[in-house]
Amino acid sequence: MLPCGPALTFVRCLVRKKNIKGEGLEDSLCRCLSTLDLIALGVGSTLGAGVYVLAGEVAKSDSGPSIVVSFLIAALASVMAGLCYAEFGARVPKTGSAYLYTYVAVGELWAFITGWNLILSYVIGTSSVARAWSGTFDELLGKQISHFFKTYFKMNYPGLAEYPDFFAVFLILLLSGLLSFGVKESAWVNKIFTAINILVLLFVMISGFVKGDVDNWRISEEYLINLSEIAENFSSYKNVTSIYGSGGFMPYGFTGTLAGAATCFYAFVGFDCIATTGEEVRNPQKAIPIGIVVSLLVCFMAYFGVSAALTLMMPYYLLDEKSPLPVAFAYVGWGPAKYVVAVGSLCALSTSLLGSMFPLPRIVFAMARDGLLFSFLAKVSKRQAPLLATLTAGVISAIMAFLFDLKALVDIMSIGTLLAYSLVATCVLILRYQPSLTYEQPKYSPEKATLAASKRESAVSESQINMIQESHFSLQTLINPSSLPTEQTATTVNCFVGLLAFLVCGLSALTTYGTHFIANLEPWSICLLATLVVSFIVTILLIQRQPQNQQKVAFMVPLLPFLPSLSILVNIYLMVQLSADTWIRFSIWMALGFIIYFTYGIRHSLEGRHSDGDGDSCSENSGLQEKNPVEEVDEPENANESDKFLARERTSEC
C-alpha cells in the first residue's frame, strides 16, 4: 500500500481546483472599464483585417454569394462558445479567462495546459498582426520599407523571416508601453480605432448596396461553362463542367457553403479577450456577458453586410483573393474608394493588435499569481496594471515578429483557441450539475446573508436525504435521479462528460479520415458512425436527466446540455482538421510547458500552499466545495501577495 501513497498525492496535485474566496473578488486590479469599453474591445479584436480579405477569398473558392450563409453558420457556432464564456464571466469575475474557468472546474493540470496554449496563441497573434500592419503600411508606401531591408538586412535562413521587421517591433513595444501605462488609456485608443473601422465598413456596405447588382447572385451555369471554356481553352471538348461551380446563390453547393463556414469560424475568434478583464471592469457579472454577446452580434452584422455588398458589386468568380474590396470598387468605377478601405484596414489591424496584446499579459499575470509561472510576473504597477507581465509579453512578441516567418506557426493559434473553447463548454456542463457553487460572491448585506444561509441549510438537508436514498448507483437512479444535485449525480455527469469528449473525438476522426469509406457505404464505417452518433445523443440525454444546481447568476447558458455539447463537437471537429505538422509543433510547445510546470509550477502552486495547512501538501481543494465561513475570513496568512499589494480602498483608483 505504501507505494500508492505518493502516486495518489501526485494525482491530487494535478486535479486540485482553485478555491476562489470572496475577498479575492474584491481586491482586484483597477476597475475602470465600462460595458461599452468591453464591446469595443471585443469588436476591435474580432473584427480585424480579415473582414477586408476573408470575404473575397471564401466567396471565390468555397461559397460564392452564399458566403452570407457561411458567416451565419459560423456565427451560430461561435455564439455557442461565446455563451459559455458569458456564463463563466458572470460566475467568476476575475482575470484569467479560460485558464481560470478550467482551474475552478476541472483542475490544475488542464488549467495550465489551457493557459500555456493561450499564451502561445496570443504571442503568435500579436506578432503576426504586427507584421501584417507593417506590410499593409509598406504597400501604401510602394514597398519601399521592405525593399530597403531586403537590400541591407536580408536573412537567408530556413524558418526565419525574409528580413527583420523593425517597424513591427516598434509597434509592439509602443503598444506594450501604452498597456503598461494603464488600461483606461488603452481602452480610449481602442474605441477610436474601432469607431473608424466600423464607419469604413458602413461605407463599404452602403456603397455595395447602391452599386450592387442582384444578377450577380443569379449567374447561370451555362454562362459559367462558356467562361470555363474560354479560360481553360476547352472548346474542343464536350461535356465541359464549369470551374466556377454551377452558378446561382450556392454555386459550389451546400457542401461549399459549409466549407466556407469552417473558414469563417476563425473570423469570430477574439471575443474571449473580454473574459480576461474580470478584475478591470465595473460590474463584471453583467458587463462581461453583455460585452461578449453584443460584440459577436456586431461582428456578424459587419461580416454579413460586407460579404453581401462585395458579392453584389462584383461576380464572385472575378473577386481578388488578396485585395477584394479595392478591386471591387474599381470594378464599379469607384477607384479612389481604395484609400478609404486602406484607412479602415489599418484601423482594423490596430484594434486587432490591441486585442491580441491586451489579454496576453493578463493570462501570464493570472498564472504567475497562482504560482504556476514565475512569481515576478505577478507584480503590478502603482497604476494597478500587470507591468512586468506586459513588458515581458511585449518583448517576446517583438522578438517573434522581428525574426521569424510566422505563416507556418499561425495554425497553432487555432489549437489554443479551440482547446480553450472546448474546455470552457466542458466546464459549464460540469459546474451546472454540481451540488454547491459558492464562488459567485454577491455584495454582502445581512438580509442576503440570512436568506442565503437558510437556502443553504434547506438545500443541504434535502441533498443529504437524497444522498442517503441514492447510496447505490443503479439504472433507476440514472434515469430518475433526485430533484437536487448530489455528489453521486455530479460524479455521474462528470463521467458522462468525459465519455462525451471521447465520442466527439472518435466521431470527428471518423468523419475526417474515413470519409471515403463512408461514401462507399463500407459496412464497418456505417456501423461505427451509427454507433458513435447514437451514443453521442444518448449521452447528452442522460446528462439532461440529471438535476441542475438551482443557484442563479446574471447570465446562464440556455438549452443545457445541448448548446455546450454542440460547441464541444464543433471545436474538436475543427481541431481534428489541422495538419500533422501543426500538432507536432504543438507537442513541442507543450513539452516545454510541462517542463516548467513539473519543475516549478506544481511546487509553487498557491493552491498547494493552501493545502499545506491541512497537513496534505497536495490535497485537492475544490473550487466548488463550501468551506467553513470562519475559515474563509480568518486566513490572512493564505492571502495572495498581489491581493495584499492592492488595498481595498485603492481598487477604484486608476
Swiss-Prot record:
The keyword Transport applies. Gene3D superfamilies: Amino acid/polyamine transporter I. It is found in: Cell membrane. Keywords: Amino-acid transport, Cell membrane, Glycoprotein, Membrane, Transmembrane, Transmembrane helix, Transport. Expressed in liver, pectoralis and gastrocnemius. GO terms for cellular component: cytoplasm; cytoplasmic vesicle; Golgi apparatus; plasma membrane. Residues 1-37, 87-103, 184-191, 270-289, 361-385, 431-489, 544-554, 603-654 are cytoplasmic. Residues 631-640 have a biased composition (Acidic residues). It is a multi-pass membrane protein. One of its GO terms (molecular function) is L-ornithine transmembrane transporter activity. The chain crosses the membrane at residues 38-58, 66-86, 104-124, 163-183, 192-212, 249-269, 290-310, 340-360, 386-406, 410-430, 490-510, 523-543, 555-575, 582-602. It catalyses: L-arginine(in) = L-arginine(out); L-lysine(in) = L-lysine(out); L-ornithine(in) = L-ornithine(out); L-homoarginine(in) = L-homoarginine(out). Residues 611-654 are annotated as: Disordered. One of its GO terms (biological process) is L-arginine import across plasma membrane. InterPro entries: AA/rel_permease1, Cat_AA_permease, CAT_C. Residues 641-654 have a biased composition (Basic and acidic residues). Glycans are attached at residues 226, 233, 239. Belongs to the amino acid-polyamine-organocation (APC) superfamily. Cationic amino acid transporter (CAT) (TC 2.A.3.3) family. Low-affinity, high capacity permease involved in the transport of the cationic amino acids (L-arginine, L-lysine, L-ornithine and L-homoarginine). This is Cationic amino acid transporter 2. It comes from Gallus gallus (Chicken).
